């Protein structure tokens, strides 16, 4: 994992720590993963499609149950990343859960500030339901900003009377755009990927003219009651630690089933190193097992 952490720091954190924040540079470095070698599960099929007017990729592992689905929102601070660059992560979770994953190419800020990504998430979620996937057979998956988008989508679904998914698996979710102090400062040096120096710029790029404290932007600022079971994975060395721990605490206080698994000293989004890093394989197996069980099927693992 040291090489993975070093590469992530050099590619992303160095751009986030530069004297001036060049969002285009940050985006390019976040997206370089799509050009790096990756290994996908044997027998995986990739099917580009459009759902609710949004470009998506269906990732269907061999032996998957087609009566259920997982909708995946990628990370990237709302300004970068893509379903393509995070395909390996989504594909290996799909294999572990024996469930097709719909990876969403939502619109990015600053060209498309809030509510563009949020609207895309809701459109795809609604389209998957309309296609006949029962809510009890539907899960959500999200990492970093995509984790925040997943929780925001669940809040909105509840508020609008749309059926909620059966469960959500979240990787180091960014859940409070207004947060300061705490792990944001305590882990500023130890976080191998993220940096605070231009955090306000990223928030402004996504929030635009909207209040970043709005629950659909910062789900930890909202009422979590009624949400489905959630599994959260986070590293103790990253600046988003407080978001994950806060979701567990606030969720349990609201009567939810939320488990936050804390991993020691790993880089942000270490799961994206699957299948090369053993820590990533173990984490992805856990994510897949959680979703597999919640969506009603025996568990399958990552090799």
What would you call each of these model-derived segments?
Residues 1-64, 296-303:
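A glycine/proline-hinged amphipathic helix-loop "lid/cap" segment
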């Amino acid at each position: 994992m040291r090489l993975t952490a070093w590469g992530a720091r050099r590619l992303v954190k160095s751009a986030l720590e530069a004297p001036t924040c060049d969002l285009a540079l940050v985006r390019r470095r976040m997206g370089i993963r799509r050009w790096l070698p990756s290994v996908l599960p044997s027998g995986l099929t990739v099917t580009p499609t459009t759902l609710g007017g949004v470009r998506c990729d269906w990732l269907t592992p061999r032996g998957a149950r087609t009566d259920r689905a997982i909708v995946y929102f990628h990370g990237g601070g709302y300004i970068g990343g893509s379903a393509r660059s995070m395909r390996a992560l989504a594909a290996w979770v799909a294999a572990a859960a024996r469930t097709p994953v719909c990876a969403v190419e939502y619109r990015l800020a600053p060209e498309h500030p809030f509510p563009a990504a949020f609207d895309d998430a809701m459109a795809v979620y609604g389209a998957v339901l309309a296609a006949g996937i029962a809510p009890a057979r539907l899960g959500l998956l999200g990492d970093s900003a995509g984790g925040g988008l997943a929780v925001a989508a669940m809040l909105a679904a509840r508020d609008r009377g749309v059926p909620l998914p059966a469960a959500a698996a979240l990787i180091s979710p960014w859940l409070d755009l207004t947060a300061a102090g705490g792990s944001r400062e305590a882990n500023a040096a130890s976080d191998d990927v993220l940096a605070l120096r231009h955090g306000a710029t990223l928030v402004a790029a996504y929030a635009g003219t909207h209040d970043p404290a709005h629950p659909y932007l910062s789900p930890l600022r909202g009422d979590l009651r009624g949400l489905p079971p959630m599994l959260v994975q986070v590293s103790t060395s990253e600046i988003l630690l407080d978001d994950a721990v806060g979701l567990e605490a606030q969720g349990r206080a609201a009567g939810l089933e939320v488990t936050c698994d804390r991993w020691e000293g790993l880089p942000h989004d270490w799961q994206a190193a699957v299948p090369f890093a053993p820590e990533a394989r173990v984490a992805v197996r856990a994510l897949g097992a959680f979703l597999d069980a919640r969506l009603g099927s025996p568990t399958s693992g990552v090799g």
